[in-house]
């Protein structure tokens, strides 16, 4: 089952740009926005990314992060 979503108070400039992008892809505004929302929903949530990063094994880089940054900046 699908649902209807309404977005209020969209600035005129933003609406114009979205309509132009939809037209450039030969899509209706509704289809264009639905495709973009689907892309957003496919992106991992920040909490999931952070959990995956936390689960990675720690590596000894032989220097602190600050030292590595300083070294890279001096090159």
Swiss-Prot record:
Alphabetical UniProt keywords: Toxin-antitoxin system
UniProt xrefs under Pfam families: FitA-like_RHH
Any one GO biological process: regulation of DNA-templated transcription
SUPFAM superfamilies: Ribbon-helix-helix
Described function: Putative antitoxin component of a possible type II toxin-antitoxin (TA) system. The cognate toxin is VapC12.
Protein known as: Putative antitoxin VapB12
């Amino acid at each position: 089952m699908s649902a209807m979503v309404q977005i209020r108070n969209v600035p005129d400039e933003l609406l114009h740009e979205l309509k132009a992008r939809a037209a450039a892809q030969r899509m209706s505004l509704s289809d264009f926005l639905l495709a973009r929302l689907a892309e957003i929903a496919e992106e991992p949530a920040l909490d999931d990314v952070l959990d995956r990063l936390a689960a990675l094994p720690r590596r000894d880089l032989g220097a602190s992060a600050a030292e590595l940054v300083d070294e890279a900046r001096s090159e």
